[in-house]
């Protein structure tokens, strides 16, 4: 997919449970490189987000992408850009076109198939692109890694494996619907998803990325020794 002169720009779409934890560590991979990153999310930090996402009390009321990019830019000598609006096809495609010197790496950390359809549409429009799409429930998840070089696609997109739900884009969801959504997730699951995505980003930078699907189970590598008595 790449050679030693490839420059990547990582677009983290959705900086909630998984995306905010990924964004916290992704800058460390970019230190000393010419790669760039951008956070995209139209959501606002709420006090309930502090427990499971990468935000602190001083961030409450701020846009999530803005709050995280502000932290990253203060901690690391890289430029983390942000877009404080929910992702649309037109907005994401325009952002990518503005940085044509970079191969876009679209990282989907969203919780709705309506946005996934947008991300796949952008992927299909581009000739050179990497798409890392994550999804998880309370205890497990999966990551689809699909690439395209000179218009040739490697591995399947999520929608090519199963039918998407006809859910709503965040822009079309009312405040009441958002409050009633009740999408239960856990910090440990989100953290494991974020680390798994980070591994794929590292593999990409090291020119070792493999396309396909990764299944992530938060209990897979947890071992219990019942012989010990407290």
Regions found by a protein language model. Give the residues of each.
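Glycine-rich phosphate/adenylate-binding loop
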Residues: 2-9, 16, 101-105, 109-230
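Glycine-rich adenosine-cofactor-binding loop
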Residues: 6-30, 38-46
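Active-site catalytic pocket residues across diverse enzymes, especially alpha/beta-hydrolases
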Residues: 26-30, 54, 123, 205
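Conserved beta-strand segments of alpha/beta enzyme cores
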Residues: 36, 79-81, 130
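Glycine-rich phosphate-binding loop and adjoining beta1-alpha1-beta2 segment
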Residues: 36-77
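Conserved acidic residues
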Residues: 84-88
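Short amphipathic alpha-helix with an adjacent loop that forms part of the alpha/beta core around
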Residues: 90-101
């Amino acid at each position: 997919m790449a050679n030693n002169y490839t420059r990547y720009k990582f677009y983290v779409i959705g900086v909630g449970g998984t995306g905010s934890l990924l964004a916290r560590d992704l800058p460390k991979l970019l230190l000393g490189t010419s790669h760039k990153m951008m956070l995209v999310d139209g959501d606002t930090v709420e006090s309930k987000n502090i427990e499971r996402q990468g935000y602190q009390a001083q961030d409450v009321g701020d846009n999530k992408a803005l709050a995280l990019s502000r932290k990253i830019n203060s901690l690391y000598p890289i430029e983390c850009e942000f877009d404080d609006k929910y992702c649309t096809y037109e907005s994401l495609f325009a952002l990518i076109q503005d940085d044509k010197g970079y191969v876009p790496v679209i990282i989907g950390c969203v919780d709705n198939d309506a946005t996934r359809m947008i991300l796949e549409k952008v992927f299909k429009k581009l000739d050179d692109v990497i798409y890392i799409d994550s999804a998880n429930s309370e205890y497990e998840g999966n990551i689809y890694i699909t690439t395209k070089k000179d218009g040739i696609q490697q591995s399947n997109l999520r929608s090519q494996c199963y039918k998407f739900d006809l859910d709503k884009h965040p822009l079309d969801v009312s405040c009441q619907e958002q409050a009633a959504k009740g999408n239960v997730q856990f910090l440990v699951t989100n953290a494991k998803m974020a680390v798994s995505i980070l591994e794929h980003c590292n593999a990409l930078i090291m020119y070792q990325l493999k396309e396909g699907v990764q299944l992530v189970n938060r209990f897979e590598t947890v071992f219990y020794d019942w012989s010990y008595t407290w």
